[in-house]
């Protein structure tokens, strides 16, 4: 963290401030590479790519504060760090955790120094209008080494004899604003990647889609509460945990020959199996009664007798 000592002399403060701003500009501004849409080089699914782009449209108060976000991200990344995972979401989320931690405190320090410079700015000095300050979209097109020069030219075009201390204040406010917008995009991307590790990319994609639908629906036609990712993933977890596991082992198929099904037919009132061997035909004519034995000629005594 760097400190800018303010001296009572305007010239001393101005010279020291300009020297500090030009030398440390490359170390104080967030790398603009984090603001570029990079999902094309990550080989994302088309639905996940659209959901990631839609993260930028979500309201600012939807995301946690910087401190809470970094803490939650570290908790989610800790198991992957221990196993030295090289998953896509792990690598990118780790990059944004480091970037946000490094530049968030620096940006806050730039605001504090800019506010402290007000004491040495002449009270009659008018602030530089927003149109003369470099915006985030313009900073993406300007080389980092030329950023200070471009901003200085705009201040001179606004007022050629603008006080030097006020110029330093304008520079710091412009750079802090660029950093804040870059950190906001980095914060949204960090939220996306570490939630993909917690819930799965498909579930986060589905959640973003439902949330945007809920936000775009008029209030009187939508539910009172916004959808949550816990509610979306809960049915899947219940279905997986509710399956009953059988204690026995299932008999494998195809290892034993299938038993041939026995077909039976009825021939003149007698049941005969086709699979059995057929007996030799009887000399009796088919359908004639069987001859009785000699003992069967005697009539059995009547039960009345």
Swiss-Prot record:
One of its GO terms (molecular function) is structural molecule activity. Residues 258-277, 295-305 have a biased composition (Basic residues). It is found in: Secreted. Keywords: Host-virus interaction, Secreted, Signal, Viral immunoevasion. GO terms for cellular component: extracellular region. InterPro entries: Hepatitis_core, Viral_capsid_core_dom_sf_HBV. Residues 273-305 form a propeptide. The record marks 272-273 as: Cleavage. The keyword Cell inner membrane does not apply. Residues 226-305 are annotated as: Disordered. Residues 1-19 form the signal peptide. Homodimerizes. May regulate immune response to the intracellular capsid in acting as a T-cell tolerogen, by having an immunoregulatory effect which prevents destruction of infected cells by cytotoxic T-cells. Belongs to the avihepadnavirus precore antigen family. This is External core antigen.
